[in-house]
Amino acid sequence: MDTSLGARLAESIGVHGPMPFDDWVEACLYDPDGGFYASGGGAGRRNDFLTSPEVGPLFGAVLARWMDSRWEVLGRPEGFTVIEVAAGIGTLARSVVAAGPACLAGGRYVMVERSASSRDEQPTGGCLSSVPDLSVLVGEGPVDHGVVLANELLDNLAFGLLEVIDGRWHQVVIDGPHGVSGEFRMVPGEATEPPVPVDAGSRPSGTRIPVQTAAAAWVAEAIGLVGAGSVLVVDYTSTTPEMADRPSGQWLRTYRGHERGGEPTEVPGSQDVTVEVAVDQLPPGAVADTQAAFLRRYGIDNLVEAGRRLWEERAHLGDLEAIRARSRVTEAKALLDPTGLGGFTVLEWVCS
């Protein structure tokens, strides 16, 4: 009996009919027995895509400065809590803790990660702890003072798709395997309204937009969790009208082994499925900036200069400290690149 994810999805569609696109993405990414992340996919040099924390420890060192700045604004409270969602194997947590932010001297750093295999690789001890879902912390009640942060999470939350057909928006759903190839297909579903005003009548049939209900709900939940502090997300972003004006293949992307993957319907669970984050579908009130500007505001240039001086002092030794110092220069280039990671958007909601 075929128990693969594809076979199970085909069986479900055969019984219940075409599947909403967001349910399809959820299964392809997070099914515990065949989803992309449960099967070992993820960020890192040996995996499928590279995020800012995997570039090196410099990103975490700058975020540690941001955390301290928020702690200072709140009056240096005891018990300051840092919550990192989609923490993976703890790469960012390691870098932040290694930087030694003052806010964690009497505080805690909680990694939230739904993948059990990733949690098994996370660092432990000291101020660090781990939970499988943000709801665990929500159940404990509001965090008096702290921050919630997520790097490239929202683009990986399940999202729906709408498509213009004869001047109206329709849901996009997934139908079961058909024909000799046995491929899943995206087909039109029921007519519906878009999440924000985007005129379908003025756009050609086939125009698509994402519906990012889960991303909006996540931000709202994170804001509600923090009594005083901030919610910070880093991601590649756009707006719903902007995406309506572009081919969907430009903003709905798949990745496998550091390269672009195939169609989102191709071999369920074999590739990452991502979407640009529509900021106009998120809760209002965020302060937005580019990653490059954010990192400069919190001292990346000073850290790089300090690393350059340390390298000059210790280059003749060639020890690990000297090599790490030299690495800051190349890390900064990647993190600040306006055509790459530096062009990502940083959104911060201040909670009080």
Residue ranges and their predicted role:
Residues 147-200, 248-256:
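A mobile, often basic/glycine-rich helix-loop segment
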Residues 1-144, 293, 299-302, 307, ...:
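Rossmann-like AdoMet
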Residues 120, 157-159, 241-242:
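Short helix/loop capping segments that flank catalytic or ligand/cofactor-binding pockets
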Residues 194-352:
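Long, Lys/Arg- and hydrophobic-enriched amphipathic alpha-helices
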